[in-house]
Amino acid sequence: MAIPAFFVLCCALICPCFQARKKGIGHSVLPKELNSMDSVSSLETNSVSEKIMASPLRMPPSPSRFSMSPKLDRIGSVHLNMSQVARATRNFSSSQLIGEGGFGTVYRAELPDGKVVAIKRARKEYFEALQTEFRSEVELLSKIDHKNLVKLLGYVEKGNERLIITEYVPGGTLREHLDGLKEKILDFNQRLEISIDVAHGLTYLHLYAEKQIIHRDVKSSNILLTESMRAKVADFGFARLGDDSDKTHVSTKVKGTVGYLDPEYMKTYQLTPKSDVFSFGVLLLEILTGRRPVELKRSRDERVTIRWAFRKYNEGKYMEMLDPLMNEMVDEDILEKMFGLAIQCAAPTRADRPDMKSVGEQLWGIRMDYLKSERR
């Protein structure tokens, strides 16, 4: 689909009245650009599961801690070859398949030493178009270190194979949980904690990584959950380094997923961290309502979730907005704050959106209020 068509659809997601006040279809992803590369390497593996306890805004003690991120060729290697990968994935058996996306398919794999990892394999039929995405994900993942971001463990680039090896996150995607495909439905407290985790991960990318990173594809299917229902942001194929000069934006081709795309970015081709903030606002509405950004099977006045949510928010019908699968009562003051923050993040112009650090702080304050309300 051409870019103008995406622009029309995504602009339709924004209610014009936003400016006056600060389970349906699958995700459609914009095409990738081309690039070339030729190297083989892998990174050291380590423990991949860790329970993240609830805490205030979890930030690195100092940005300087990450100022000397090691280059790929300096990180301890596990020297995985294709025969080892084939054994670990049972020759890429469908029984090991745990996910699919724009880059390719993801498999659960057990290494010879017993470690369980995830191996993402590029689609061969789209190999040329996916080379840029592969390089971007490897290079950017190698520079980050945060509990709420999926950790890169290794990669293989040999012949016609492109593999990315990451930590294994066993809980599946957030979207699967919202669709009710898992054993238990997420309760409100879990959804609030997941929102905070994602905000922390994005804040790290924007402010505390060695260089500013803009994710560009924040969505529910790119949020992985641990067994204890803590969130990790995944899939950095569309990620882009922010500008390290005095500029306020990066001019670049539009990439991302329909329904989550910043309308100002689509109009001007100017990418900023506030583009991730917009996507997070859409995600937060998704977490609270259970609805996808666009649901064509619903009635006309409910197909675009942002429009529907804004109308309900102005009417003060917060409980009607809450995902009915939760089947629980939540203090309306808490819901008003949560939905209000989501709508503010999804403002049509970046100047009206908070930054991710502020979003995380507001969510933490909402969490404190929620815990107090539960004790009453």
Give short role names for the model-derived ranges.
Residues 1-14:
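Single-pass alpha-helical transmembrane segments
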Residues 14-37:
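Membrane-proximal cytoplasmic juxtamembrane segment of single-pass cell-surface glycoproteins
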Residues 37-376:
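Conserved eukaryotic protein kinase-like
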